[in-house]
Amino acid sequence: MKRAHFATLQPRCVVCHEAPLAITSAIRERDDDILEGILGCTNDKCQREYPIVDGIPILVAAIRGWLNANALQILKRDDLSPEIESLIGDALGANSSFDTLRQHVGIYTYDHYESKESAVLALLDAALSLAGDVPGGAAVDIGCSVGRTTFDIAARFAQLTVGVDLNFAMLRVASHALREGRVSYARRRVGLAYDRSDIEVDLPARELVDFWCCDAGLLPFRDATFAVASMLNVIDCVAAPRDTLAECSRVLRDGGNVLIATPYDWAPTATPVEQWLGGHSQRSALRGASEPALQALLREMKFEIVAERDQLPWRLRLHDRSAVDYSVHVIAARRT
């Protein structure tokens, strides 16, 4: 965690929602960067502690439950040889937590850093072109995944930018790219066969970027902190889209811009059906359509839609012989 980002953003406790956080322990540092440490709530009646691991502060309210559910992500080694990692993967088998994790990380890392035609960067460019001129100020990349878009946003606006996500394994890739200028991941060839990809990455505006582990529906930032927020392929991946948009509205200043992209690929494993924006109740006036549901919710959350485009392609590589194609709705909106 960069001290400069912490000092500028002045995060608050996500449990008591009142007190600012303080750096109570810096266990391992490099220059102005805390790689391991502890943040603490300054409210005497709360005193919640939050760990910093691999340079990433974990600012989650239900920290005990989150750590228990994500222990593999936190404790997973990255120093095993490809041969031993392959043997372990074969032994654990398909659909194991280990294999699911490396599949997901590999899918997004390839698109963000190794693909010559990055779909997510194309979506970001499209969203930025729709937004037009935006006010100066800090930016937040909500649902940043492995982080490539966060660097481009920082470079575009030349402002402090923080990428937030709840997936620690993805954030670890982003943090390593930020701090070491390298990306190393298992790229799936077919089945349980993976090839280790270790590449040097030349990233813009690294000095302006940091990555934090946060719940998009309960952000640790003060009201009106940011001038720009991006939410690329996030709305249909969170437990409560309404809460996520409400938090985005809260942390954006008046006149701030939000960039949204979504294929409305609703799945009950990520979002309870009751929380979907459209995608059900086709007997209603909207006939189950998601687009007008999102547009109406944005207006409810004090956003004015500036421009939008539909049917933009987003392709994700699954393995050498398989990919999934989405058709994405992109919206640029301004907080009023």
Question: Across the structure, where does each feature detected by a protein language model lie?
Answer:
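S-adenosyl-L-methionine
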Residues: 179-215
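Conserved alpha-helix/loop element of class I SAM-dependent methyltransferases that forms part
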Residues: 104-136
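A short glycine-rich, Lys/Arg-flanked "PGG" loop and its adjoining helix->strand segment in the class I
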Residues: 242-254
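Conserved SAM/SAH-binding beta-strand->alpha-helix loop
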Residues: 167
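Conserved SAM-binding loop of SAM-dependent methyltransferases across substrates and taxa
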Residues: 146-157
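Conserved class I S-adenosyl-L-methionine
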Residues: 135-145, 162, 259-288
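A short acidic, Gly/Pro-enriched loop at the edge of an enzyme's catalytic core
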Residues: 214-229
